């Protein structure tokens, strides 16, 4: 929607998808799959009218790996996210909230790290952070998204709503279609139908409200 109307939109992808093997694609885990996923991300950005994506290249499903060094690899991700934001100087950053949409561990962790960058003061001054959400009244009877449960955000927190039209919908479906190593056409149609049900013409967001608002608990 915004890209079509002249706004500069940049998609930043934290992980490289190398472990996301799908039987139908016949691509083994590793470098070959990571390369395909990178090409798919570029294809998807083009369909959306966005700038070429920024690929941070962290190993898929590796953000939650235990390390003898506290904070690794999330500290490295935090540093890269802060550097990327300060290079791009966006007005708005969109990411997953604490629930990660449908609970994906990398989605949860990336959203947490982005929030950490903001609350530490490392994000550019004036940049605002929003989390995409699913309203409870839509999740109650929602179709399964890739066979998984989606997690709601309370309606009163979803204070920003961005409407989309048929042109936006068509662009989003073409963008989804770029990710052929991740899902079959039938699976893509199923997931797109789920998102259509969950959002029903407008995407809701919760704004991060960082900063002190009260000096006492009571």
Please annotate each region the language model reported:
Residues 1-88, 116-123:
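Active-site rim/loop-helix segments in enzyme catalytic domains that contact anionic ligands
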Residues 66-218:
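Metal-dependent de-N-acetylase/amidase catalytic core
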């Amino acid at each position: 929607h915004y890209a079509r109307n002249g706004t500069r939109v940049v998609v930043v992808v934290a992980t490289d998808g190398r472990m996301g093997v799908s039987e139908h694609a016949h691509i083994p885990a590793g470098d070959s799959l990571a390369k395909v996923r990178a090409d798919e991300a570029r294809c998807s950005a083009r369909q959306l009218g966005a700038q070429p994506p920024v690929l941070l290249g962290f190993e898929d499903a590796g953000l939650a790996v235990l390390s003898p060094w506290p904070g690794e690899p999330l500290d490295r991700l935090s540093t890269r996210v802060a550097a990327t934001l300060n290079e791009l100087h966006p007005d708005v950053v969109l990411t997953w909230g604490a629930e990660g949409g449908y609970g994906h561990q990398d989605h949860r962790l990336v959203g947490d790290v982005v929030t950490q960058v903001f609350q530490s003061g490392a994000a550019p001054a004036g940049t605002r952070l929003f989390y995409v959400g699913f309203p409870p009244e839509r999740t109650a009877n929602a179709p399964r998204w890739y066979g998984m449960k989606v997690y709601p955000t309370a309606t009163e927190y979803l204070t920003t709503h961005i409407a989309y039209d048929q042109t936006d919908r068509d662009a989003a479906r073409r963008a989804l279609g770029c990710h052929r190593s991740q899902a079959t056409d039938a699976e893509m149609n199923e997931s797109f139908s789920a998102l259509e049900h969950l959002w029903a013409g407008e995407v809701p967001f919760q704004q991060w409200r960082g900063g002190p608002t009260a000096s006492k608990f009571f």
